[in-house]
């Protein structure tokens, strides 16, 4: 349970950033809150990919975030995690590139 915040104490936590456009633009009205949350997590991962120099041959930053990690992060089942990825793709927020051979997808 959290206590009250005093002074600068609210800054001791780390946060996921969610673009306001996901909540304000009519085209994202039907995007689920869970998908918006996942998008914030993916954006956070994008920063790590930049630091690690994860670029494809065209210089685009990608992330690797397997379904299992989504399940762990959001406390959901496999089918829900897969549905959230599809939802983000449908709204044009991510693109997944399949690599095959049991390797996780690259996410742009």
Please annotate each region the language model reported.
Residues 1-24:
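An N-terminal low-complexity regulatory-tail signal and nearby short nucleic-acid-interaction modules
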Residues 7, 33, 45-108:
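Winged helix-turn-helix DNA-binding recognition segment
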């Amino acid at each position: 349970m959290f206590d009250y915040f005093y002074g600068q104490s609210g800054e001791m936590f780390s946060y996921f950033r969610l673009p306001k456009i996901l909540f304000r633009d009519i085209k994202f009205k039907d995007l689920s809150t869970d998908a918006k949350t996942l998008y914030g997590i993916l954006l956070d991962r994008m920063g790590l990919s930049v630091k690690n120099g994860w670029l494809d041959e065209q210089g685009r930053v990608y992330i690797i975030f397997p379904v299992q990690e989504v399940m762990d992060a959001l406390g959901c089942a496999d089918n829900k995690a897969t549905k959230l990825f599809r939802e983000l793709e449908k709204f044009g927020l991510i693109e997944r590139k399949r690599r095959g051979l049991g390797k996780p997808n690259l996410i742009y």
